[in-house]
Amino acid sequence: MRIFSGDNKVVDSLASNPGLMSPSNFGGDFGSRLKVNVTSKKKLNDSSPTSPMESSPVSPELVPILTLLNAHTHRRYHEGVFLILQDLNNNGTHAARKWKDVYGVLLGTQLALWDAKELAEFTDPSCPVSEKKLKEVASKPTYINLTDATLRTLDNSDNIVMECGKNLTNALVVSTTLKNRYFLQFGNKESFNAWNSAIRLCLYECSSLQEAYTGAFISSRGAKLGDIRILLTNRKYDYKDWVSVRFGAGMPWKRCYAVISQSSSKKKGHFGEINLYENDKKVKKNHAMATIVEAKALYAVYPSSPKLIDSSTIIKVVGSVKFEKKESAQEKDVFIMPEKHQAVPSYDTIIRFLIPAMDTFKLYGRPEKLLSSKNDPHSLLFGLPVLPHIYYLEVEDLLPLTNSVSSLHWSNNEWKEHISDILQRKIAQGYCGCNSTSNITSPLPSPFLGSADLFERADGVLSPKLSYGSKSSSNNSSKNSLPKRERVKLSSSSEQDLNNSDSPSIKRKSPPLVISESPHKVHTPTDASFRTRVTEGSPYAKQRHPKPFASSVNDSPSDRAKSRTVPYNNNDRKATTPEKFERGETSCGKNVDESLEKVRNMKLEIPESNFDKFMTDKNLLSVDSKCSNEKKLSVESDLSAIYEKYSNGPFGHTEGLNGSSDETYLRFQRASVHSESNYNSRKSFTPSDFSNGNEEEHAVLQELNSLTQRINELGMESINSNSDSDRINGSYSQVDFGNNNDEDDMNLFDPDFMAQDQLRAEERDYNKDDRTPLAKVPAAFQSTGLGITPDDDIERQYITEHRSRHEVPKRSPEKPSNPLEIGNPYAKPGTRLNTTHTHSKTDRSITPQRGQPVPSGQQISSYVQPANINSPNKMYGANNSAMGSPRNPKTRAPPGPYNQGWNNRPSPSNIYQRPHPSDTQPQAYHLPGNPYSTGNRPNMQAQYHPQQVPMPILQQPNRPYQPYAMNTHMGSPGGYAGAAPPFQPANVNYNTRPQQPWPTPNSPSAHYRPPPNLNQPQNGSAGYYRPPAPQLQNSQARPQKKDGFSQFMPSATTKNPYAQ
């Protein structure tokens, strides 16, 4: 079967296909792609570098994990030349299917690719045009993201042949996002094993670090949940909520309803399942859109930036999915994103999904207990490196697996199990990680890949050579600060040693990974000007010009280009150890930079390359080891002389980014204070830290404590501030679980909370000058000011605030009372605009005691008109002493019982009468900032002007009346002994008819507002029945005034028009 066909025309499939386009954070000019994550705006102080934790928003519990994640992002796993062919586009259609010779660098899970043919076309450094073209080509690599990729190896059983008639061997099939699929073919078995091991290791470390991040995330954020004890208990409950799901990376998100069902059996092989429905109406299993029946891994996805940790809710499930009930399960990567809820933190949402999901598939020790041991392969923290170690394994550790014939048929899960077996055996011998370094420039470097990662050697997470030319770097006397580059002239003895050297590694054709002398040969430091590296023993390092180093500084770059494999000194090279390279020293004890200056301009050879005859010879598509040796082509790419010109601005690292140089190189200066001894001096948790004298109380939190203890053993004490360290080393007994009475614990889900709070605050500010308390309320009963008033507070304020009728608070003319609320016994004290007259027991109308006359100068007033009213009737004046208003302190009511209401009906004592629901109406709703606004009440006229008094209710046509004082507690004289009953709104029909200005002298008082005779039609509608009230007996006639408000009061001489 042939899958590769087409004409001989070269098609740039990598550049033309959108699936291989560079991500948005890559590309651009060569120098502008270097992104430095400056987390502080402070000026750099060499004597006291700023701690990363002082400017980083990340909690200290997550810093060790984020350090390892970013170290993995910038790790250079492997590099070399191979052939690539894109088989399918992102939509599943056939691509160009043309082989292309590329030079690739695997950085983390990003595979950067350059067209090897284009790189070889511009080998003349003396030509300015070539330099410009080479810069453009080198600055725009193509990236393939392998984070969620699926790998499969091809062998003879696949029966895939090329156009030359030979089987496709030493090839990998890579399926990435959407439906993109690529074929990667390597020159020989050794190269294939090296690349296969590197890609498998990078995927294993990526998933393992994501699981460790999940453990650290639950440990640091889970303690903030108030019911974390209940959530971690071993109890089975179903989880139901709306989520967004996508099946595979790059697929569209679909909103569905997720139901996590727990297993009813405790056996090992019985799991629950996650059912996904299109809606929350039909949640039966036969209506499920998809069902996750098994999960091998489940973890929270790190959002690539520390600032997004608390807002990201993406979860990845690696398992088996059924889309139909009768079909077999398919292995899929499912991404689930629980929907966020208002006023609920994102970490709360994701943790409440993670724990039940782990329980249903019995992952990581759940539902019994989260495993925190780094020796247990089922733990979230299995094999986690201990800082300063930053990697799980070396690529060479996986070579025995790739050399095995059986590994050709392993699935991704089987590869993970075999890699875990290797790591477990090493951990049993005291293994703590690899690639130790004390030159970690920052625990939180930039997640972006730039020119420093692509073309420059990084001893640690990022190369310290980025600080060349920085004043702060040159002035720092720390051993990690490298001096400025200077041209080094070799002595004659050194030249003789190099001429006489005959390194056996030059003749070696195997890749550098199989050499057991140094596990770090892939990462041998090179000069900043020559960033594409070839190591000792590499097939790419065949010596073309065994000419000794040039001794003159005036030699041209082409004369100074030498072979990379020639040692610095053949006698001292044998004593060089990886540890000395890690410490920044060579075998002779000198700085690496001094030795690297001798070999900074070397030629890069690309062996087994075929791009010179790419368009003529089809057979060159086959790179079988037998035929490829006969047609092997070696093309030199003298990149070193070109890149040397870009080591300075604007494309090099001596020119800072926008802003001060101190900000640009801040994270590199921090490396001077992070020594290896500081990393090992971290204090970890002990069981006594969490006991606090009560072990049973914190038994459930032991899972989080164990995770925190393991994470804090990573040794990052030097990057934490004192306050953060104290907080980490404290016990969980001091963790706030949401029981404090602070603002964060308020019930934000109360729909009336915000409205009440705003109303109270606005009305208090509005009436702070008008409300003079008549009786001081004790501090214990003062209002909380948060929109919530205790019951006792309401009662005492209602009684004491209006106890006396003889004192009236001073009222400012520009802020008068609200007439609509006068006489409303259900208005809450905290929400009324005016508290001068309310229907408390002191505000009831007072009648003389039976048998006793009323003094001639005393009048009973029930309504106080605001001052400055343009009215000819002087009896409504604010200071009219003849009225006997409450402003006259000498006016007193005669002793005796109070009148029991507007109709003076006798009523049995101690009987509470609740008004009919339709007898009341809602209070006037005031929007903040406008005390006279009508709010959202329909068809309601605006509030009265402060200097306008409404007409009596009875004279307002077809207007509903407000509640009156008939439903008083008859056991106490005049009204309620405590708080008023709750307000009950009713359906009220408002009108907008014009109102008459003021009551006529024959109209009844507006104070009493009795209901009309409901037995008679009122504007076309019949009202309620009102029983007649008994008349007063033995009451003496009061002196009749010719005018005044008292003429409308019932007496012996004046009949009450509403008594019948």
Curated annotation (Swiss-Prot):
GO terms in the biological process aspect are: signal transduction
Biased amino acid composition, Low complexity? 465-481
Per the record, its GO cellular-component terms are: cellular bud neck; cytoplasm; nucleus
Q: Which Gene3D superfamilies match?
A: Pleckstrin-homology domain (PH domain)/Phosphotyrosine-binding domain (PTB)
Q: Which SMART domains match?
A: PH
Kindly state which keywords UniProt assigns to this record, in alphabetical order.
Activator, Cytoplasm, Nucleus, Phosphoprotein, Repressor, Transcription, Transcription regulation
Location of the PH domain: 75-204
Question: Ranges of Polar residues compositional bias?
Answer: 490-504, 845-883, 900-923, 931-942, 1048-1060
Its localization reads: Cytoplasm; Nucleus; Bud neck
Region (Disordered) spans which residues? 465-589, 801-942, 955-1060
Give the modified residues of type Phosphoserine: 491, 510, 518, 538, 556, 871, 885
Signal sequence, start to end: none
Ranges of compositional bias, category Basic and acidic residues: 571-589, 801-814
Write down the superkingdom of origin: Eukaryota
Q: Which GO terms describe its molecular function?
A: protein kinase activity
Q: Which family does it belong to?
A: Belongs to the CAF120 family.
> Any other comment in the entry?
Present with 1380 molecules/cell in log phase SD medium.
What does it do?
Answer: Acts as a component of the CCR4-NOT core complex, which in the nucleus seems to be a general transcription factor, and in the cytoplasm the major mRNA deadenylase involved in mRNA turnover. The NOT protein subcomplex negatively regulates the basal and activated transcription of many genes. Preferentially affects TC-type TATA element-dependent transcription. Could directly or indirectly inhibit component(s) of the general transcription machinery.
**Could you describe the subunit structure of this protein?**
Subunit of the 1.0 MDa CCR4-NOT core complex that contains CCR4, CAF1, CAF120, NOT1, NOT2, NOT3, NOT4, NOT5, CAF40 and CAF130. In the complex interacts with NOT1. The core complex probably is part of a less characterized 1.9 MDa CCR4-NOT complex.
Q: What's the name of the protein?
A: CCR4-NOT transcriptional complex subunit CAF120
Q: What is the lineage of its organism?
A: Eukaryota, Fungi, Dikarya, Ascomycota, Saccharomycotina
Gene name? CAF120
